[in-house]
Amino acid sequence: MNTKVKIDKLNVHFGQTHAVKDVSIDVPENTVTAIIGPSGCGKSTMLRSLNRMHDLFPNARVTGKVLLDGNDIYDRKVDPVSIRRRVGMVFQKPNPFPAMSIYDNVVAGYKLNGRVKKSDADEIVETSLRRVALWDEVKDRLKSNSMELSGGQQQRLCIARTIAVQPEVILMDEPASALDPISTLKIEELIEELTEKYTIIIVTHNMQQAARVSDYTAFFYMGDLVEWGETKKLFTTPEKKQTEDYITGRFG
Protein backbone atom coordinates (compact mmCIF):
# COMPACT_ATOMS: atom_id res chain seq x y z
CA MET A 1 0.00 0.00 0.00
CA ASN A 2 1.40 3.39 -1.01
CA THR A 3 2.24 5.95 1.66
CA LYS A 4 0.36 9.20 0.98
CA VAL A 5 1.57 11.24 3.96
CA LYS A 6 4.85 10.50 5.73
CA ILE A 7 5.35 12.33 9.01
CA ASP A 8 9.01 12.25 10.04
CA LYS A 9 10.22 13.44 13.47
CA LEU A 10 7.63 16.22 13.57
CA ASN A 11 7.76 18.73 16.41
CA VAL A 12 5.42 21.68 16.95
CA HIS A 13 6.14 24.48 19.44
CA PHE A 14 4.00 27.45 20.45
CA GLY A 15 6.39 29.77 22.21
CA GLN A 16 7.82 27.69 25.07
CA THR A 17 5.12 25.02 24.80
CA HIS A 18 6.19 21.80 23.08
CA ALA A 19 2.81 20.65 21.74
CA VAL A 20 3.81 17.77 19.42
CA LYS A 21 6.97 15.80 20.21
CA ASP A 22 9.07 13.98 17.63
CA VAL A 23 6.19 12.18 15.89
CA SER A 24 6.70 9.78 12.98
CA ILE A 25 3.79 8.10 11.15
CA ASP A 26 3.26 6.72 7.63
CA VAL A 27 -0.33 7.29 6.45
CA PRO A 28 -1.36 4.87 3.66
CA GLU A 29 -3.22 6.18 0.63
CA ASN A 30 -7.03 5.85 0.49
CA THR A 31 -7.39 4.95 4.15
CA VAL A 32 -8.86 6.58 7.26
CA THR A 33 -6.46 7.30 10.11
CA ALA A 34 -7.98 8.35 13.45
CA ILE A 35 -6.08 10.43 16.00
CA ILE A 36 -7.32 9.84 19.55
CA GLY A 37 -6.29 10.97 23.02
CA PRO A 38 -7.47 13.13 25.94
CA SER A 39 -8.09 16.87 25.64
CA GLY A 40 -4.92 18.89 25.23
CA CYS A 41 -2.80 15.96 24.05
CA GLY A 42 -1.87 17.55 20.72
CA LYS A 43 -4.41 15.90 18.39
CA SER A 44 -5.65 19.03 16.65
CA THR A 45 -2.18 20.60 16.69
CA MET A 46 -0.87 17.51 14.93
CA LEU A 47 -3.69 17.61 12.38
CA ARG A 48 -3.21 21.27 11.53
CA SER A 49 0.49 20.78 10.94
CA LEU A 50 -0.39 18.57 7.96
CA ASN A 51 -1.53 21.49 5.79
CA ARG A 52 0.61 24.23 7.31
CA MET A 53 -2.18 25.99 9.17
CA HIS A 54 0.33 26.86 11.91
CA ASP A 55 1.96 29.26 9.44
CA LEU A 56 -0.86 31.63 10.41
CA PHE A 57 0.44 31.91 14.01
CA PRO A 58 3.63 33.95 14.56
CA ASN A 59 4.65 32.09 17.74
CA ALA A 60 4.36 28.64 16.11
CA ARG A 61 7.48 26.72 15.13
CA VAL A 62 7.43 23.43 13.23
CA THR A 63 10.45 21.16 12.73
CA GLY A 64 10.78 17.78 11.08
CA LYS A 65 9.18 16.76 7.81
CA VAL A 66 5.72 16.14 6.40
CA LEU A 67 6.03 14.43 3.03
CA LEU A 68 3.07 14.47 0.65
CA ASP A 69 3.76 11.95 -2.11
CA GLY A 70 7.42 12.15 -1.13
CA ASN A 71 7.70 15.96 -1.22
CA ASP A 72 8.20 17.97 1.98
CA ILE A 73 5.33 20.44 2.41
CA TYR A 74 7.57 22.57 4.66
CA ASP A 75 10.21 23.07 1.98
CA ARG A 76 10.88 26.81 1.58
CA LYS A 77 10.00 26.63 -2.12
CA VAL A 78 6.52 25.23 -1.45
CA ASP A 79 3.54 27.59 -1.53
CA PRO A 80 1.32 26.96 1.55
CA VAL A 81 -1.79 27.83 -0.47
CA SER A 82 -1.03 25.06 -2.94
CA ILE A 83 -0.67 22.63 -0.03
CA ARG A 84 -4.04 23.64 1.43
CA ARG A 85 -5.58 23.01 -1.98
CA ARG A 86 -4.21 19.46 -1.95
CA VAL A 87 -4.88 18.90 1.75
CA GLY A 88 -8.38 20.10 2.66
CA MET A 89 -9.75 20.76 6.15
CA VAL A 90 -13.15 20.17 7.76
CA PHE A 91 -13.60 21.75 11.18
CA GLN A 92 -15.45 20.69 14.32
CA LYS A 93 -18.25 23.22 13.99
CA PRO A 94 -19.94 23.51 10.58
CA ASN A 95 -18.70 26.76 9.04
CA PRO A 96 -20.48 27.49 5.76
CA PHE A 97 -19.94 31.03 4.52
CA PRO A 98 -23.04 32.70 6.02
CA ALA A 99 -23.51 35.37 3.35
CA MET A 100 -23.45 32.82 0.53
CA SER A 101 -25.98 30.47 -0.99
CA ILE A 102 -25.58 26.70 -0.94
CA TYR A 103 -24.41 26.87 -4.56
CA ASP A 104 -21.85 29.62 -3.95
CA ASN A 105 -20.45 27.84 -0.90
CA VAL A 106 -19.55 24.81 -2.99
CA VAL A 107 -17.75 26.79 -5.71
CA ALA A 108 -16.14 29.32 -3.37
CA GLY A 109 -12.72 27.66 -3.55
CA TYR A 110 -12.79 27.52 -7.32
CA LYS A 111 -13.71 31.19 -7.58
CA LEU A 112 -10.72 32.13 -5.43
CA ASN A 113 -8.49 30.57 -8.07
CA GLY A 114 -10.05 32.42 -11.01
CA ARG A 115 -13.14 32.64 -13.17
CA VAL A 116 -15.27 29.54 -13.64
CA LYS A 117 -17.68 28.92 -16.52
CA LYS A 118 -21.30 28.60 -15.43
CA SER A 119 -21.56 25.11 -16.97
CA ASP A 120 -18.39 24.01 -15.16
CA ALA A 121 -19.62 25.47 -11.88
CA ASP A 122 -22.95 23.67 -12.24
CA GLU A 123 -21.16 20.38 -12.74
CA ILE A 124 -18.83 20.97 -9.78
CA VAL A 125 -21.78 21.77 -7.52
CA GLU A 126 -23.83 18.74 -8.51
CA THR A 127 -20.90 16.32 -8.41
CA SER A 128 -19.70 17.56 -5.01
CA LEU A 129 -23.15 17.57 -3.44
CA ARG A 130 -23.90 14.09 -4.79
CA ARG A 131 -20.65 12.81 -3.34
CA VAL A 132 -21.71 13.92 0.15
CA ALA A 133 -25.29 12.65 -0.33
CA LEU A 134 -26.74 16.16 -0.12
CA TRP A 135 -27.84 16.78 -3.71
CA ASP A 136 -31.32 15.27 -3.42
CA GLU A 137 -31.97 17.28 -0.26
CA VAL A 138 -31.00 20.68 -1.67
CA LYS A 139 -31.18 20.53 -5.49
CA ASP A 140 -34.38 22.61 -5.56
CA ARG A 141 -33.00 25.37 -3.33
CA LEU A 142 -29.39 25.83 -4.35
CA LYS A 143 -29.77 29.61 -4.22
CA SER A 144 -31.04 29.53 -0.63
CA ASN A 145 -28.78 30.79 2.13
CA SER A 146 -26.54 28.04 3.50
CA MET A 147 -27.53 28.93 7.07
CA GLU A 148 -31.05 27.61 6.40
CA LEU A 149 -29.66 24.06 6.42
CA SER A 150 -29.62 21.86 9.51
CA GLY A 151 -26.35 21.35 11.37
CA GLY A 152 -25.75 17.98 9.75
CA GLN A 153 -26.52 19.35 6.30
CA GLN A 154 -24.19 22.30 6.91
CA GLN A 155 -21.35 19.95 7.79
CA ARG A 156 -21.92 17.88 4.65
CA LEU A 157 -21.96 21.15 2.69
CA CYS A 158 -18.58 22.02 4.20
CA ILE A 159 -17.25 18.63 3.12
CA ALA A 160 -18.66 19.25 -0.38
CA ARG A 161 -16.91 22.63 -0.43
CA THR A 162 -13.67 20.90 0.55
CA ILE A 163 -13.81 18.17 -2.09
CA ALA A 164 -14.96 20.59 -4.84
CA VAL A 165 -11.36 21.78 -5.27
CA GLN A 166 -10.26 18.15 -5.68
CA PRO A 167 -7.88 17.67 -2.75
CA GLU A 168 -5.92 14.47 -2.27
CA VAL A 169 -6.10 14.40 1.54
CA ILE A 170 -8.95 15.52 3.82
CA LEU A 171 -8.28 16.48 7.43
CA MET A 172 -11.29 16.33 9.76
CA ASP A 173 -11.17 17.85 13.25
CA GLU A 174 -13.99 16.16 15.20
CA PRO A 175 -16.43 16.65 12.30
CA ALA A 176 -19.41 15.08 14.07
CA SER A 177 -18.96 16.23 17.67
CA ALA A 178 -21.49 19.07 17.32
CA LEU A 179 -24.09 16.94 15.51
CA ASP A 180 -27.04 14.78 16.52
CA PRO A 181 -26.75 10.94 16.31
CA ILE A 182 -28.51 10.65 12.92
CA SER A 183 -26.30 13.34 11.35
CA THR A 184 -23.26 11.71 12.93
CA LEU A 185 -24.15 8.39 11.30
CA LYS A 186 -24.42 10.10 7.90
CA ILE A 187 -20.99 11.70 8.35
CA GLU A 188 -19.47 8.34 9.32
CA GLU A 189 -21.01 6.62 6.29
CA LEU A 190 -19.72 9.45 4.12
CA ILE A 191 -16.18 9.09 5.48
CA GLU A 192 -16.16 5.43 4.48
CA GLU A 193 -17.34 6.26 0.95
CA LEU A 194 -14.83 9.08 0.50
CA THR A 195 -11.83 6.78 0.98
CA GLU A 196 -12.40 5.47 -2.54
CA LYS A 197 -10.88 8.74 -3.74
CA TYR A 198 -9.28 10.47 -0.76
CA THR A 199 -6.94 9.81 2.15
CA ILE A 200 -8.63 10.91 5.38
CA ILE A 201 -7.13 11.80 8.75
CA ILE A 202 -9.67 12.43 11.50
CA VAL A 203 -9.35 13.70 15.06
CA THR A 204 -12.03 12.32 17.38
CA HIS A 205 -12.74 12.17 21.12
CA ASN A 206 -15.17 9.34 20.43
CA MET A 207 -13.30 6.04 20.60
CA GLN A 208 -16.31 4.10 19.32
CA GLN A 209 -16.32 6.36 16.29
CA ALA A 210 -12.59 5.81 15.75
CA ALA A 211 -13.15 2.06 15.90
CA ARG A 212 -16.04 2.27 13.42
CA VAL A 213 -14.60 4.53 10.73
CA SER A 214 -10.82 4.15 10.74
CA ASP A 215 -8.33 1.69 9.31
CA TYR A 216 -5.46 2.98 11.46
CA THR A 217 -5.37 4.77 14.81
CA ALA A 218 -2.77 6.97 16.49
CA PHE A 219 -3.02 7.45 20.27
CA PHE A 220 -1.52 10.68 21.59
CA TYR A 221 -0.80 11.69 25.17
CA MET A 222 0.84 14.95 26.30
CA GLY A 223 2.15 15.61 22.80
CA ASP A 224 3.72 12.17 22.41
CA LEU A 225 2.64 9.48 19.98
CA VAL A 226 2.15 6.56 22.37
CA GLU A 227 1.01 3.98 19.84
CA TRP A 228 0.07 3.75 16.19
CA GLY A 229 -1.20 0.81 14.18
CA GLU A 230 -4.15 -0.95 12.61
CA THR A 231 -7.32 0.11 14.41
CA LYS A 232 -8.61 -3.40 15.08
CA LYS A 233 -5.33 -4.46 16.65
CA LEU A 234 -4.88 -1.27 18.68
CA PHE A 235 -8.36 -1.54 20.17
CA THR A 236 -8.22 -5.29 20.90
CA THR A 237 -4.56 -6.03 21.68
CA PRO A 238 -2.72 -2.73 22.25
CA GLU A 239 1.04 -2.97 22.74
CA LYS A 240 1.28 -0.26 25.40
CA LYS A 241 -0.44 -0.35 28.80
CA GLN A 242 -1.10 3.39 28.54
CA THR A 243 -3.11 2.74 25.39
CA GLU A 244 -5.09 -0.02 27.08
CA ASP A 245 -5.80 2.22 30.09
CA TYR A 246 -7.11 4.97 27.82
CA ILE A 247 -9.33 2.87 25.57
CA THR A 248 -10.81 1.05 28.58
CA GLY A 249 -11.68 4.35 30.26
CA ARG A 250 -9.20 4.27 33.13
CA PHE A 251 -8.21 7.83 32.30
CA GLY A 252 -9.11 10.51 29.79
UniProtKB/Swiss-Prot annotation:
Localization of this protein: Cell inner membrane
InterPro entries linked to this entry: AAA+_ATPase, ABC_transporter-like_ATP-bd, ABC_transporter-like_CS, P-loop_NTPase, PstB-like
GO biological process: phosphate ion transmembrane transport
One cellular-component annotation, GO: plasma membrane
A Pfam family: ABC_tran
Reactions the enzyme catalyzes: phosphate(out) + ATP + H2O = ADP + 2 phosphate(in) + H(+)
SMART domains: AAA (SM00382)
Binding site for ATP: 37-44
UniProtKB keywords: ATP-binding, Cell inner membrane, Cell membrane, Membrane, Nucleotide-binding, Phosphate transport, Translocase, Transport
Listed GO MF terms: ATP binding; ATP hydrolysis activity; ATPase-coupled phosphate ion transmembrane transporter activity
Enzyme class: translocase
CDD domains according to UniProt: ABC_PstB_phosphate_transporter
Record membrane topology: Peripheral membrane protein
Homology family: Belongs to the ABC transporter superfamily. Phosphate importer (TC 3.A.1.7) family.
Free-text function comment from the UniProt entry: Part of the ABC transporter complex PstSACB involved in phosphate import. Responsible for energy coupling to the transport system.
Complex formation: The complex is composed of two ATP-binding proteins (PstB), two transmembrane proteins (PstC and PstA) and a solute-binding protein (PstS).
Official protein name in the record: Phosphate import ATP-binding protein PstB
Organism: Geobacter metallireducens (strain ATCC 53774 / DSM 7210 / GS-15)
